[in-house]
Amino acid sequence: MEFAHLTVLSLFCLAFVGITATSPREDYWQSIWPNTPLPKTFSDMLIPSGKTNSLPIKSEELKQYSTLFFEHDLHPRKNFILGNTNSVGSIIRPFTKSRQGVTDSIWLANKEKQSLEDFCYSPTAIAEHKHCVSSLKSMIDQVISHFGSTKIKAISSNFAPYQDQYVVEDVKKVGDNAVMCHRLNFEKVVFNCHQVRDTTAYVVSLVASDGTKTKALTVCHHDTRGMNPELLYEALEVTLGTVPVCHFIGNKAAAWVPNHTADNLCVM
């Protein structure tokens, strides 16, 4: 199955906050990409910042991170119900089995149960390169260093709140081997930026059961040998390394890819 690459007109880029730079992170963003406002998704990913008993990924958002499916399911009129694995947290970190006391649910774990050090300094999975960063500036620097250019763009999901039934309207390919940056579910602002080889990112246009139109950033893994075998079998009844497996990316994350267009709004 072939998917059209995103065109300038159809490209789904992050929503922007149309405000003048008034904070250090906004000033830094403007220094890299002048006249391009800080995207709203990044503002949302930075909230809350150190607030007591306040985590960035709310309970109603968990199903955004707990849906596995096959690549051939990405076609118009396909129905999806979010959440097809009992291990809700595992889909956030689906690449490795539990080891050395570090569980797959680390991204959704309470900080008293797991520490950031457990996650950030744990061994990488097969074909994975990862870095933990503690600010938007560090994320930008890391991604620019990775691609060797500021001509890049970021793409995110905008799942509708309290909706878990969707129908696919359209599928657009974003690119291969994107760098994903996820907000970890701790009060302290920390992002996990990682790239897994042999992956393809898509933007999937969805219509919720109440008629709301949304976009879902989606990643398909063509090499699943580094994924959690129990998770794969639980959700899809397949074994490692047999077929491509995909999952949605929730609202508190972004994919960075090279920008080959001339559309300034997407040069971020």
UniProtKB/Swiss-Prot annotation:
Domain BURP span(s) in chain numbering: 68-259
Pfam families (UniProt xref): BURP (PF03181)
Glycosylation-annotated residues: N259
PROSITE patterns: BURP (PS51277)
Tissue specificity comment: Seed.
Region ranges (2 X approximate repeats): 166-222
Signal peptide span: 1-22
Keywords annotated in UniProt: Glycoprotein, Repeat, Signal
Start and stop residues of the Sequence repeats: 50-55, 83-88, 101-106, 166-183, 202-222
Region (3 X 6 AA approximate repeats): 50-106
Descriptive protein name: Embryonic abundant protein USP87
Taxonomic source organism: Vicia faba (Broad bean)
